Amino acid sequence: MKQDHSAQLYDEAKSLFPGGVSSPVRAIKPFPFFTKSASGSHITDVDGNEYIDCCLAYGPLILGHGHPAVKEAITKQLENGCLYGTPSEIEVKYGKLIQKYYPGMQKLRFVNTGTEATMGAIRAARGFTGRDKIVKIEGGFHGAHDAVLVKAGSGATTIGVPDSLGVPVDVVKNTLQVPYNDIHALEETLEAHKDEIACLIMEPVMGNMGPILPKDMYLRAVRNVTRDYDVLLIFDEVITGFRVSIFGAQGYYGVEPDLTTLGKIAGGGLPIGIFGGRKDIMETVAPQGGVYQAGTYNGNPLSLTAGMATVEVLEKESVHHKVNAKGKALWQSLTDIVRGLRMEGQVTPTGIASMFQLFFGPQPENYEQALKCDKLKFNEFWKHMLQNGVFFPPSQFETNFLSLAHSQADMEQIVTACKKSLAAVK
């Protein structure tokens, strides 16, 4: 596979950007491919190599690249302007549509990224409760702000240790950690810090270490325990919102949090974040209350237009039914390949079909178990997949995604590429 132009661009990029990229996950070794264009389920690099895209920009593109309805909506909005600095009608329309599927978001705030959404939700929880401590799940990723940049799986301690230079220990000393799928660890932590904890923030389905599904009744138990200890529950649905179902993971599992964060799919491929929840909590947010949050690009009409167009397609075209049918067939095919090769490996998860990953090891249930998989073998597998024309996210702990745009031919090529790649790394 020829990648000369990508290699040249990477050399130039290294003189411009830290590590040659604008986000660390893109720093593929020895160099990343540089994208020229993308359409539907395919992405093409500057050297003319075309790949079936199962990364899909790390989750936002459930309709695929450049869906006609989304492009048409953006084009129409551009004719009316791309940024106002005032409220707009699209905010009201899209806000009502969000509430239709996430009724627990009784009031909400449009922001620009998932990071901003989780930061706003945590700040609102702290402001509402008057408490400083928060709990997060080991291995859970909630953006790049200081309070949640805590090293996961840090041995026996639950006290936060910064996972980035530049984050003061004093900032994260109020960030506690518990393992996923362990209700007893959560109870013990809440008991040990009774009346000190503002909130638990968690991905209901762990999207940044797998994905990994909740055990039966785990989320319901989390909801009950947080209520018992008067701790607010935040579901970070930046990945799972509009992905697990149109109602998100909270609708899929029937568990309503106090606060929700959305992003990715909710922006239709443009930058967005949303946080919202119970009316009494959200009324502490400025200008109604004393919890400050603001932004020049909040409520950006282009992002809201793209997001609303995406959700309308999800409604009209039974997207989840179609994508899940593809995903279930793919899961079975990949599982059969792994078993046929007698490899120690798992295709996870088994129940949510548009999200999947291959683990070379036992089925993980939490971050500590996920870390024990054979990451070196995954890296080799990933390289073979790219050579075979399929682009998976380059990290073992990221999630592969399917979209409406993936055709039957795409699915067959993914299976063929996996069979060749798995055989090569056996």
UniProtKB/Swiss-Prot annotation:
The compartments listed are: Cytoplasm
Residue(s) carrying N6-(pyridoxal phosphate)lysine: K264
Quick one: which pathway?
Porphyrin-containing compound metabolism; protoporphyrin-IX biosynthesis; 5-aminolevulinate from L-glutamyl-tRNA(Glu): step 2/2
Kindly list the GO CC terms recorded for this protein: cytoplasm
What keywords sit in the KW lines?
Answer: Cytoplasm, Isomerase, Porphyrin biosynthesis, Pyridoxal phosphate
- Write down the HAMAP family for this protein, in alphabetical order: HemL_aminotrans_3 (MF_00375)
Q: Which GO terms describe its molecular function?
A: glutamate-1-semialdehyde 2,1-aminomutase activity; pyridoxal phosphate binding; transaminase activity
Q: What is its EC number?
A: 5.4.3.8
**Isomerase as UniProt keyword:** yes
The GO annotation for biological process reads:
protoporphyrinogen IX biosynthetic process
User: What cofactor does this protein call for?
Assistant: pyridoxal 5'-phosphate
Q: Which domain of life is it from?
A: Archaea
Catalytic activity annotation: (S)-4-amino-5-oxopentanoate = 5-aminolevulinate
Output the CDD domains linked to this UniProt entry.
Answer: OAT_like (cd00610)
Protein name in UniProt: Glutamate-1-semialdehyde 2,1-aminomutase
Q: What class of enzyme is it?
A: isomerase
Q: Which NCBIfam families match?
A: hemL (TIGR00713), PRK00062.1 (NF000818)
What protein family does this chain belong to? Belongs to the class-III pyridoxal-phosphate-dependent aminotransferase family. HemL subfamily.
Gene3D superfamilies recorded for this chain?
Answer: Aspartate Aminotransferase, domain 1, Type I PLP-dependent aspartate aminotransferase-like (Major domain)
